[in-house]
C-alpha cells in the first residue's frame, strides 16, 4: 500500500493546515525532518510575539508552558504522520513528565523540537522531547509528554 507520505515531501507540509491550533497559539512554523520514529520542528520567536510584552517587559522570555505547548504540537504532528493522517485531529495533553528547563528562549531565537515516539497504548501516546536553540544547539527544555488522540473526532 502506498501512503500519502510516500507522495509528498513532509518538509513542505504546513503545520497550520494540520493542527487545530491557529495563531497566535500555533507554535510550529515548519517541519524540518521526519522519519518513522522522530520529527524535528521549528518555531522562530519574533520580537512581536504577544507573550513577550508581559513575560517579562524588561527581559522577554518565552514562558515554559508555551515551550511545552510547542513540544506538544510537534508531538501531535509526529503522531499524525505516523498514522498517515494529514487532516487535523483533536489531541489532548494529559500529562507532562520530568520536564526541565535549561536555557532561556528569547526574542530572535529559533527553537527546534526533536520528538521521539516512546509508546502507544490505545489512544494514548508518550513522546520524549528535547527543545534546543537552532543557533548554538543549547538545550532549552527536555521531558516527556502523554496525550490522548481522538481519532474518531476528526475535524473535517
From Swiss-Prot:
CDD domains: FabZ. Its EC number is 4.2.1.-. This is Uncharacterized thioester dehydrase BH1850. One of its GO terms (molecular function) is lyase activity. Belongs to the thioester dehydratase family. FabZ subfamily. Keywords: Lyase. The active site is at residue 55. It is an enzyme of class 4 (lyase).
Amino acid at each position: 500500500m502506498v501512503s500519502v507520505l510516500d507522495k509528498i515531501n513532509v518538509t513542505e507540509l504546513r503545520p497550520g493546515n494540520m493542527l487545530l491550533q491557529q495563531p497566535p497559539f500555533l507554535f510550529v512554523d515548519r517541519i524540518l525532518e521526519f522519519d518513522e520514529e522522530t520529527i524535528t520542528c521549528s518555531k522562530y520567536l519574533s520580537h512581536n510575539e504577544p507573550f513577550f510584552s508581559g513575560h517579562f517587559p524588561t527581559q522577554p522570555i518565552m514562558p515554559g508552558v508555551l515551550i511545552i505547548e510547542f513540544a506538544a504540537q510537534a508531538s501531535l504532528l509526529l503522531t499524525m504522520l505516523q498514522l498517515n493522517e494529514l487532516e487535523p485531529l483533536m489531541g489532548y495533553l494529559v500529562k507532562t513528565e520530568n520536564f526541565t528547563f535549561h536555557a532561556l528562549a528569547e526574542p530572535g531565537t529559533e527553537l527546534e523540537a526533536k520528538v521521539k515516539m516512546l509508546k502507544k497504548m490505545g489512544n494514548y501516546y508518550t513522546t520524549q522531547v528535547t527543545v534546543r536553540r537552532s543557533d548554538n544547539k543549547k538545550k532549552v527544555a527536555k521531558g516527556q509528554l502523554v496525550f490522548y488522540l481522538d481519532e474518531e473526532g476528526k475535524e473535517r
